[in-house]
């Protein structure tokens, strides 16, 4: 009997130690996928250490991907996962230890980050970091010295990505789905996943970008310091994901998939909330935005090479 009591006490203590997370924006399927991984302790895919306990619904009235889904996902969080809903972002602050900004509309991110900073808690920002480079830089300025933040695509943690981070890479060709979104940065809608895959392998250091466009694809070629090159092929209407990594003496192909599961990403998100240290440096995340901004400028100039800075 004493063993049972001790075991129950141990389990209760472990559950009590879970970080409490609050969601901003319930207009993406990520809010359901992430909550299942965090809150379902009986699942073999369970990620321990944090739980979603509260949410602010949010939503964008002029974006179909938002207004067609925001209520549906909010209802599922409320009924299936007993997540408490609050009327505004400020009301999340006393209820949570960390904030997950999930709003599908990147145009909202800067203003929502500014409000979330009042909580003084770490902030996870789902892709894209922002809808423009200017907003991304404004997020960095606003958060500096106040709250740590982290943003990434799940493809950074896809199958075999870590295995090809060779020290002698000369170039990478990455490809995947490339439906285009709205300007100012149309790559932030979906092709950002391929850009993130490229950066996961290449690392930062891109200096110049050239972009060409056809009806069924965009090709963006970046020149890195030291003469390395990285290429993104954003394919429409859809594509699997992959990368060909060139190194001294040969090449290696990998096939990560965005549908492989979000568990590796969610594990990194929980570690971030625990340590308050982003696994992807903020400087690299901002360079991803600079890469897409330079690609947009190159496109507007008819494919002329554009410097990142």
Can you describe what each PLM-predicted range is?
Residues 239-277:
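Interdomain hinge/lid region at the active-site interface
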Residues 172-240, 283-286, 290:
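Rossmann-like dinucleotide-binding domain that binds NAD(P)(H)
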Residues 99-100, 272-309:
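C-terminal helix-rich "cap/oligomerization" subdomain common to oxidoreductases
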Residues 3-13:
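Sec-dependent N-terminal signal peptides
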Residues 129-184:
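A contiguous active-site-proximal alpha/beta segment in oxidoreductase catalytic domains
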Residues 17-119, 141, 204, 224, ...:
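N-terminal glycine-/serine-/threonine-rich beta1-alpha1-beta2 phosphate-ribose binding loop
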Residues 120-122, 127-128:
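Short helix/strand-capping hinge loops at secondary-structure junctions
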């Amino acid at each position: 009997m004493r063993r049972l009591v001790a075991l129950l006490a141990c389990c209760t203590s472990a559950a009590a130690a879970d970080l409490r997370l609050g969601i901003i924006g319930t207009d993406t399927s990520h809010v359901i996928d992430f909550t299942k991984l965090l809150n379902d302790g009986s699942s073999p895919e369970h990620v321990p250490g944090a739980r979603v306990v509260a949410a602010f619904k949010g939503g964008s009235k002029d974006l179909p991907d938002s207004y067609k889904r925001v209520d549906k996902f909010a209802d599922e969080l409320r009924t299936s996962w007993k997540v408490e809903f609050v009327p505004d972002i400020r009301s999340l602050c006393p209820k949570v230890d960390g904030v997950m900004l999930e709003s599908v509309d990147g145009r909202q991110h800067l203003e929502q980050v500014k409000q979330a900073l009042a909580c003084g808690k770490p902030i996870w920002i789902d892709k894209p970091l922002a809808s423009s480079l200017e907003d991304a830089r404004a997020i960095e300025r606003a958060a500096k010295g106040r709250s740590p933040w982290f943003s990434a695509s799940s493809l950074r943690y896809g199958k075999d990505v870590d295995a090809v981070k060779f020290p002698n890479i000369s170039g990478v060709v990455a490809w995947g789905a490339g439906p285009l979104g709205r300007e100012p940065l149309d790559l932030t809608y979906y092709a950002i996943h391929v850009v993130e895959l490229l950066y996961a392998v290449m690392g930062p250091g891109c200096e110049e970008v050239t972009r060409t466009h056809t009806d069924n694809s965009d090709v963006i070629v970046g020149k890195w310091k030291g003469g390395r090159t990285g290429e993104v092929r954003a394919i429409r209407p859809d594509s699997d994901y992959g990368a060909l990594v060139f190194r001294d003496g040969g090449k290696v192909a990998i096939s990560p998939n965005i549908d492989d599961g979000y568990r590796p990403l969610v594990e990194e998100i929980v570690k971030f909330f625990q340590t308050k240290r982003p696994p992807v440096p903020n400087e690299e995340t901002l360079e991803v935005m600079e890469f897409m901004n330079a690609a947009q400028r190159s496109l507007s100039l008819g494919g002329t090479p554009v410097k990142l800075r």
